[in-house]
Amino acid sequence: MEDGAKDDYIKDIYRHASPNADTDSFLGSPTVAIDSTLSTSNSLSNLNLDTNDSSSSPPAHNDDVPDIAEVLQEMLATTELPSSTTDLDYEPELDLVGGHRRNLGQLNDYGSPRADSFVSLDPPSIGTEVEQFLSKKKQFFILSSAGKPIYTLHGSDDVILGYLGVLQTVVSAYQADESGDNLMSFRAGKTLVVVAVEGPLILAAVSKIGESESQLRAQLDVLYTQILSTLTKNQIHRIYANQSNFDLRNLLQGTDVYLDALTREIVNGSPSILLGALEPLILRKSIREEIDGVLLSCRTPSLLYGLIVSDSKLANVIRPKKHSLHPPDLILLFSMLFNTTSFRDGEHWVPICLPKFNSTGFLYAYIHFFSKSSALIQISADKNAFFELREAKQQILSQMEDKGLIKALERAEERGRFKPVDVAVPMVRHFLYKSRAHVQYVMPSYETHYYEPHMQRGLLTFYHQLHAQVNSDSSRGSNNGWRFMHLVRNSCIGFAWITPSFELYCVSGPNVSRATLAASIHSIAKWVSQHRERLFVIGGAVF
Amino acid sequence: MATPRTSSQERFAQFKLVLLGESFVGKSSLVTRFVKDEFLEQRESTIGAAFLTQTVSLEDNKTVRFEIWDTAGQERYKSLAPMYYRNANCAVVVYDITQASSLERSKAWVKELQHRAADGIIIGLAGNKLDLEDKREVPTEEARAYAEEAGLLFFETSALTGENVLELFTEIARKVPFENSTARPRMSAKGVDLNKNGGTEAQGCNC
């Protein structure tokens, strides 16, 4: 490891004073490149994994910490595992298994039945299940600060528990050194690990597909938001204050489907999560206003927000003057409604915390799908308001029916997104336009160039790269919020244009000149601006 | 009040029914079988509660419309339950015949209903998943004895095959006195208790 600096395994350990710092403040954070010479087995024993409670173990010496980080990310980065015949050549891995088991001993003391069943697997088998787990390009882990699993994207408990133990130990080692710092991220070759410590919860994202730290952090925030929406911040803090080794899965029972739906969206490259914005349903201005009118006229006293959503696209919203809705809350809500089957039948009354609105308390959502893909959502702070809102629903739907608005919505949904040709920029294959003021984005349909799912996935990966580059520290200059990025690949060219009012990402085929692209991008911005009232939900109706 | 139709002998009543029971015993599946005569192999957990209606016809020209609260079984929703059973005329408490512990949970629900729900509430005990006879943990006689002792209607049901599902709801419809029927839907909407927990609002956590 002498040449560690040139080596893929060189790690940048980012440490940060504020656990909630956003990417902007990352500019000033110290970056420490560590050249490690200690073997992984040493580093494990340095971490006191075999003590009874690693979270209260004496702070590890600073010099040792990077090595543990190295161990962890090596574990996560490794795709090739030793076969059983070469065990001796892979001593560090075996030692990790040892760490695994010691850590499980702790979990077991806390009485987790799952840990029990795991301990009987002695020694834990390093087989195809582990190989599969390690070969994943993307991982999410949510655990408690005591190291208890809460959610993972891949891997059974048998596979993940050891990794979670190491992760928890590394995070707590940083917390224990009295600097008040939290581990933020580290990198090994192409693998980036981003950690978010949210009170008693630890969330980690592992990516081998070139996403940026801020992108992964935004993804972790989406998952954290989902957990808060079920339990609220207060409840989580109260639970762990009483019992630090609580198994939160007991309380989250049944919500895995929503976390799964979100991680599926993230893994599929959801533009909504990338841009932190909602996609509106394209609707004639007059239709949108008529629906607003119906919603307003049927509003009952308990109503806080009223929304109509078609296939995850926001059609209408009414809200009190004092409160606006927060896109991250809605991204979450829409994912619950449209990526699961839970709400498709009947009427539902659901306690939900909308964390960006108020992370400490519950609101109540009346949810009803009035057609196959369109839902009416009425949100209230009053848990007894169901029948009041139900009656409002009956009036809303009968008025909409009478005025032909349900049909109009159906037609809008059938029409779907606009086509690239509508915008008259022949060289542009696809684009994402985010209005920063409305926190909404529009894009043309994928057809023509990206009709196959794998092509769409490729396009979205490319958008992530473009987004990462144009939003990277180095390209965030003074320019008053104006930025520009030109990214040339063999098969396509990407162009990003960031202004204080919008973000525009577009992709053309190869061999398109910069001048042509610049002209196209201007045309797109102009076209969107001309059609803004049809494309976006402008402010919603206010009462 | 019963709301007899004007025509000769036809009588119509509307009852509020709440389903309670541990998670994964099949409450939503029972309701779906009753309301839509469907069964979903892969069902996601209910969160909060779902509200459905279904009408059954009885002998003597009687028609009963059920307004059904299908509640979530998870522990975290426990404190919301009173909101759903408070005005209920009838309840179905569901357990899973393949999980002995789920019957114990049912007994706790029955006790809570008998203490805290409206007087005269008709309670049905449903041992669901009758199609999984080979995995049975709760003997029929044990459950029946308990039901008799506690004064409950008792059925073993299968939401999958539909066995006894309609029978369960029909028997409940027969047992609820027509006089106890809630009034017309519109009136019942206003009748929901808006005061008891007023002011809790966002603080009304469901821990």
Curated annotation (Swiss-Prot), chain A:
Pfam families: Fuz_longin_1, Fuz_longin_2, Fuz_longin_3. One of its GO terms (cellular component) is fungal-type vacuole membrane. It is found in: Endosome, Multivesicular body membrane; Prevacuolar compartment membrane; Vacuole membrane. It is a peripheral membrane protein. GO terms for biological process: autophagy; protein targeting to vacuole; vesicle-mediated transport. Residues 41-57 have a biased composition (Low complexity). Keywords: Autophagy, Endosome, Membrane, Protein transport, Transport, Vacuole. Its main location: membrane. InterPro entries: FUZ/MON1/HPS1_longin_1 (IPR043972), FUZ/MON1/HPS1_longin_2 (IPR043971), FUZ/MON1/HPS1_longin_3 (IPR043970), Mon1 (IPR004353). Residues 41-65 are annotated as: Disordered. In complex with YALI0F03861p/CCZ1, is required for multiple vacuole delivery pathways including the cytoplasm to vacuole transport (Cvt), autophagy, pexophagy and endocytosis. The MON1-CCZ1 complex acts at the fusion of vesicles with the vacuole, through its regulation of the SNARE complex during the coordinated priming and docking stages of fusion, and particularly at the stage of tethering/docking. Belongs to the MON1/SAND family. This is Vacuolar fusion protein MON1. It comes from Yarrowia lipolytica (strain CLIB 122 / E 150) (Yeast).
